Amino acid sequence: MDYLPVLFSLLLVVFQGAPEAAVLGAELSTGPDSGGEKPAPSAPWRPRRSKRCSCSSLLDKECVYFCHLDIIWVNTPEHIVPYGLGSPSRSKRSLKDLFATKATDHRNRCQCASQKDKKCWTFCQVRKELRGQDSMEKGWDDQKKGKDCSELGEKCTHHQLVAGRKIRRLDAVRNSIKTAFRVAKLKAEIYREKKVTHNRTH
């Protein structure tokens, strides 16, 4: 007789779960007929990750930060953390998209999702031009290495002056950073010594 309440509650639980099981079975049976295109109405809506553009290299952290709108730059070394969305679903790429991106010019920094997004286009193209200028300057430096400027003319002299100024400026910045670190280290040591002597006096 003691088993009657337990048996009754067990039957109650089974019958309460039965309609849900029947509905689930009906959904499973109608799924293949409809092609599985319609999602279940009870499925929760998940936000899709919208990308402003797609970077040609994921090692380009600035591009990744610019293109992926929901990623917040967190100051951890070599780490970008998606923050606040709980890893939303991403749309799958088709083979056409894959071959289209392979066929595009790899010198572009990124590829914009919208053709009307002028800021995105300028971001992707300007960086390409800057990289072209850098490579031209590198080629110019390689060309004038070991050569006297009398052969190359005024342009060579100007480049040498600019390069000399840049090197001096970089050296000055490097030295100021080193001295700032030394001063901070000395201050930390003095503070530590004061703290130790203060603890000993009391």
From Swiss-Prot:
PROSITE patterns: ENDOTHELIN
Classification via InterPro entries: Endothelin (IPR020475), Endothelin_toxin_CS (IPR019764), Endothln-like_toxin (IPR001928)
Protein known as: Endothelin-1
Region described as Endothelin-like: spans on this chain: 110-124
Signal peptide annotation: 1-25
Location of the region described as Disordered in the Swiss-Prot/TrEMBL record: 28-48
GO molecular function, one term: endothelin A receptor binding
Gene name per UniProt: EDN1
Protein family membership: Belongs to the endothelin/sarafotoxin family.
Keyword Disulfide bond: yes
Any one GO CC term of the record: extracellular space
Propeptide: 26-50, 74-202
Ribonucleoprotein in keyword set: no
Cysteines joined through disulfide linkages: 53-67, 55-63
Organism (species): Felis catus
Superkingdom, natural source: Eukaryota
Keywords: Cleavage on pair of basic residues, Disulfide bond, Secreted, Signal, Vasoactive, Vasoconstrictor
Feature type site, description Cleavage: 73-74
GO biological process, one term: regulation of vasoconstriction
Pfam families the UniProt entry points to: Endothelin
Subcellular location: Secreted
Role, per record: Endothelins are endothelium-derived vasoconstrictor peptides. Probable ligand for G-protein coupled receptors EDNRA and EDNRB which activates PTK2B, BCAR1, BCAR3 and, GTPases RAP1 and RHOA cascade in glomerular mesangial cells. Also binds the DEAR/FBXW7-AS1 receptor. Promotes mesenteric arterial wall remodeling via activation of ROCK signaling and subsequent colocalization of NFATC3 with F-actin filaments. NFATC3 then translocates to the nucleus where it subsequently promotes the transcription of the smooth muscle hypertrophy and differentiation marker ACTA2.
